[in-house]
Regions:
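Compositionally biased amphipathic helical and low-complexity segments enriched in hydrophobic
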Residues: 38, 99, 146-148
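Short periplasmic/luminal acceptor-recognition loop of GT-C membrane glycosyltransferases, typified by
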Residues: 3-78, 107-117
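Periplasmic/luminal catalytic loop of GT-C fold multi-pass membrane glycosyltransferases
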Residues: 55, 59-63, 79-138
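Functionally engaged cysteine thiol sites
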Residues: 67, 130, 146
């Protein structure tokens, strides 16, 4: 990553004034990523129901007016941030996740398309019959159909 190609993070939100933005996944086009994040902020804030977002952009919760109900502080599928099937804590995590979804009346789980984030972070824990996958320009969205 060439840090001289970074651009002011205040283009994402004024609270990020003084910081510079560049990401290894958008190292040649940080403005493209910022455009995606700004469009995402609008989409997320206009959602009129409770959502959960699985993303590496954990700061989004602090720059939107929407509670994004992150289930974890990080997201990996190697068992480090959430137990994988076969792990002795898998059922405990599954119960934690389902309880959080029910308690917060989550209606959908969002994944940024460009992150190529494994959707197993939700599909491994919720019965496939309870999920309906849809998408828009920026997100894969799993509507939760039967957890009330």
């Amino acid at each position: 990553v060439n840090l001289s190609e970074s651009i002011p993070a205040s283009n994402i939100d004024k609270s990020l004034t003084g910081l510079m933005w560049i990401n290894p996944f958008f190292k040649k086009s940080p403005l493209e990523e910022i455009t995606i994040l700004n469009e995402a902020k609008v989409i997320l804030e206009q959602t009129n129901y409770e959502i959960m977002v699985h993303t590496h952009y954990l700061f989004l919760d602090s720059i939107t007016k929407k509670n994004l109900n992150y289930p974890n502080r990080s997201f990996t599928l190697d068992g480090a941030s959430m137990p994988i099937e076969g792990n002795k804590y898998f059922i405990h995590y599954r119960n934690f996740l389902l309880k959080k979804i029910k308690k917060n009346d989550i209606k959908a789980v969002y994944f940024f398309k460009h992150e190529n984030f494994s959707q197993k972070s939700i599909t491994n824990y919720i019965d496939h019959n309870c999920l309906e996958k849809v998408e828009n320009k920026l997100f894969y969205i799993y509507k939760i159909l039967c957890l009330k």
